[in-house]
Amino acid sequence: TLPPGFYRSLHPLGDASACNLSERNFLAALDDYRKLCALVEQHGGCIEQSLAGDTLTLAPGLTAEVLAPSGTRAAALTASMQELYRTPQGVPEFREKLDALDASMNNFSLILRLTFGKTRILLPGDTNRAGYGGIPPEKLAADLFKVGHHGQLDGADAALVNAVRPRFSVCCASSDRRYNSAHPDTMRLLKDSGAELYFSDCPPVDGQSIPPHRALEFTICADGASSARYLP
C-alpha cells in the first residue's frame, strides 16, 4: 500500500510512549514494517506498490486483480504516516495520531481477487466491512472468500455477503476468541447465505464441530470444481 522506499523516511519509535497494550503492539508493528522492508532489500528483494486496477500474473492461468486500495486511499495513508512520524512522541498529539492511525489501518489492506479458470477467490486482508467502499459489487463476486478482520462482528454485513455470494468461506480465527473472532452473528450470516464455513483454528462455533487440524487445504480446479479438507 505504501510507496517503495517509503520505509527509509521512518525512524525507530520504540514503545516508551505507549499507554496500553494496543498502542505497544501497534508501535512494534510499525517498527517491524521498517525492519522488514530493509531486510527484503538487503537480500536483493524488490518492493513494489500495487493499487486498485492493477492485475498481476502469479502463474500460468492464475491472475490477481487488485481491488483496493485506490491511489487516493494509498496517498491518504502515506500522508497520515508522515504526519505521525513528524510529531514528537512526548506530546499528546502523538498518541492521538497514533490511535487514529491504528483504528483505520486495517481498511488500507490490499484486497485481491484471484482468478483461476472459472474459480474466483477474494482475499481482503484484515479489511472490515467498511473497507470495501468504492469497489463495484460485481468485482466482489467470488467462490472462495477469506473473511476479513478474522470474522469479527464488523468483518462482513448482509450487503457484502450478497455481493460476494461465496460457496466457501474461510475464517482465520483464534481458538481463544480473544478479540471476538469468528463472531456468531458473522458466521450465521455467512452460513445462511449458503456458504460452507472453514476455519484456520478450532474456535467454538454454534452447530459445527471443527476437527483438530494443523492446516486447511483447498483444491481449486480451472473448471470450477473445488474441495476442502482439514489436515490432521
What name fits each language-model region?
Residues 1-122, 195-196, 200-232:
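Flexible, acidic/histidine-containing loops and adjacent segments that form or flank the divalent-metal
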Residues 29-36, 131, 157, 186:
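Stable alpha-helical elements in mature extracytoplasmic
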Residues 73-182:
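Active-site-proximal loop/helix segments of hydrolase catalytic cores
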Residues 137, 185-186, 194:
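Short alpha-helical interface elements
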Residues 157-161, 181-189, 210-215:
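Histidine/acidic-residue-rich catalytic or RNA/ligand-binding cores of hydrolases
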Residues 169, 190, 218-220:
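Residue-level detector of buried hydrophobic side-chain packing
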